[in-house]
């Protein structure tokens, strides 16, 4: 004999699944018939839209995710994928007009966070660019270095006030190093700003230097693309570079998925176990916290 609640735990009774009014098609797990499920949930009947695909090796994770992604593309979702491998490259070829496959090779990444695409420089853009420069610098300012962070933001403001076109990191670097005394006077910045440290570390991203491909302008236009795939296999062994590129990817995610709440957007991390192991070399924090922030905002 046992209690009724305990007995009901072992009582197998399943009702039939019901189709939603919109959504993607999956299989009914009992009868294997097509079933339409609304994973966006515009009415917010479920607290979170996030989900995970979990299976063993060869269990069909990539196949299911590709099928899911194709349906989302067909339904005019904006989809950003970060992957280790080339699972999504073929899908990009099926939709060449709206797709972009970004691979780190000799042609560069093609992400230019300094290109504001015609928008005004606001506080959000300044904060984002300050974070990018600090990553290049390998010097993330602490709470005790607020004056240095303020100085950097004023350099960024001065750059956009005096350079009207062709915005990129190389141009910003040259503006700071070539007009340093004038900027100090214009923006009332103390002379103890670490210019030598800035020019030495950030100089590694200029043409002919070690990380030139990170900032190389490839003319890539993200604005008209609704399906963007970032392939990180070639750089996963370089901890600094992989974290740096991930930070730049987050700027794209911000612009494509988080800036307009009216858009339906999905962020997919394929083989997330690889991503979760990344640690920000500047702060010592895991990438997982940044990923969680993005999913929280979608």
Where is each model-derived feature located?
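Hydrophobic anchor at the beta1->P-loop junction of P-loop NTPases
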Residues: 53
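The conserved Walker
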Residues: 57
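Pre-Walker A adenine-sensing motif
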Residues: 31-45
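P-loop NTPase motor domains
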Residues: 5-35, 84-296
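Walker A/P-loop NTP-binding motif
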Residues: 67-74
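Hydrophobic positions on the alpha1 helix immediately C-terminal to the Walker A/P-loop
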Residues: 64
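Conserved lysine of the Walker
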Residues: 61
């Amino acid at each position: 004999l046992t209690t009724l609640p305990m007995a009901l735990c072992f009582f197998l009774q399943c009702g039939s699944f019901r189709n939603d009014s919109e959504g993607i098609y999956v299989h009914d797990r009992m009868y294997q018939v097509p079933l339409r499920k609304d994973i966006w949930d515009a009415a917010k009947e479920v607290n979170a839209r996030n989900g995970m695909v979990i299976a063993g090796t060869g269990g069909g994770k990539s196949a299911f995710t590709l099928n899911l992604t194709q349906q989302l593309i067909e339904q005019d979702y904006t989809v950003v994928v970060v992957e280790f491998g080339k699972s999504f490259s073929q899908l990009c070829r099926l939709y060449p007009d709206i797709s972009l496959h970004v691979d780190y090779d000799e042609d560069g990444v093609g992400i230019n966070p300094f290109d504001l695409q015609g928008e005004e420089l606001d506080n959000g853009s300044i904060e984002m660019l300050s974070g990018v420069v600090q990553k290049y610098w390998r010097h993330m300012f602490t709470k005790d270095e607020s004056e240095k962070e303020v100085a950097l933001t004023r350099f960024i403001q001065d750059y956009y006030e005096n350079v009207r076109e062709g915005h990129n990191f190389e141009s910003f670097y040259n503006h700071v190093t070539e007009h340093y005394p004038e900027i100090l006077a214009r923006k009332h910045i103390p002379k103890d700003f670490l210019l030598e440290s800035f020019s030495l570390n950030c100089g590694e991203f200029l043409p002919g230097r070690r990380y030139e491909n990170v900032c190389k302008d490839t003319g890539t236009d993200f604005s008209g693309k609704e399906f963007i795939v970032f392939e990180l296999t070639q750089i996963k062994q370089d901890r600094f570079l992989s974290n740096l590129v991930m930070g730049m990817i987050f700027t794209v995610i911000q612009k494509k998925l988080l800036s307009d709440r009216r858009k339906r957007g999905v962020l997919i991390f394929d083989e997330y176990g690889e991503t979760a192991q990344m640690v920000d070399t500047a702060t010592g924090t895991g990438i997982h916290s940044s990923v969680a922030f993005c999913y929280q905002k979608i």
